[in-house]
Amino acid sequence: MSKILISGYYGFANAGDEAMLTAIIESLRQVEENVELTVLSGNPEDTAAKHQVRSVYRFNPWAVIQAMYASELILSGGGSLLQDVTSKRSLLYYLSIIGLGKFFGKKVMLFAQGIGPIRAKWARKLTSFVCNKADLITVRDRESASELKEMGVAAAKITVTADSVLSLKPVTGEGGRTLLQKAGV
């Protein structure tokens, strides 16, 4: 049984990020039904309940390190995590997860990422350094691949794929009506 740690912007009630997490989990379970998944989350109880995964609080360094140590693969997944427009701290957080994973000798994959913009010169250099340590990088568009290459990330590590939410099955008409009724629409 594979043990995978998933890092992203999960547990913050963002519908798009939660949809990405759902798509990632479904994709991984299609490959290996009994895969052991742990998600770093801002709300681990909610994430565990919604997605039937193990979850740890992403701002508890000891819990993160323990989860990382117990995993075989660190998957940094979904969304535009590597950018410095909204916050340089969030960029440092996600790069530290990738870097720590490699420090602990784990396989690390960036999964269906949107990259950039990364404007600060130091942030571009750090992103290049850390991403070059990753085992595999998949990005959701050509612009993200170009951004990584411009920063000096090895082209051989980068594969252009699709946004992970595109793998989700659409809701049926009846299911959609039920959701709208529950929402009072």
Give the positions of each predicted feature.
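Active-site anion-handling motifs in enzyme catalytic cores
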Residues: M1-V185
